[in-house]
């Protein structure tokens, strides 16, 4: 997966928007105003891309033990977020599943009113 594929995959999800809330380097994808995926554009340029994704604590610990490329979230809650390195032992299919899971967790955390508004749009 390259940066363009990541970009298109994330934006293909319902109500997803892109932002640069921290600096011009950190691309953040949000649903309902809440982050579900972050990545550094400079790291993509250097050839060492990674994503920060939300996950369930029990799965995060299991993934970290199972995959060398999955670690506790960098600059994030180490319990609720993971950092996934690209170009390693995580397949593109698995990466998409992790992104989908992150999106789903954040979407479910939105208020019912906001979820209803998103569903109607």
Report each predicted region and the residues it spans:
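Charge-dense, helix-prone N-terminal extensions
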Residues: 1-121
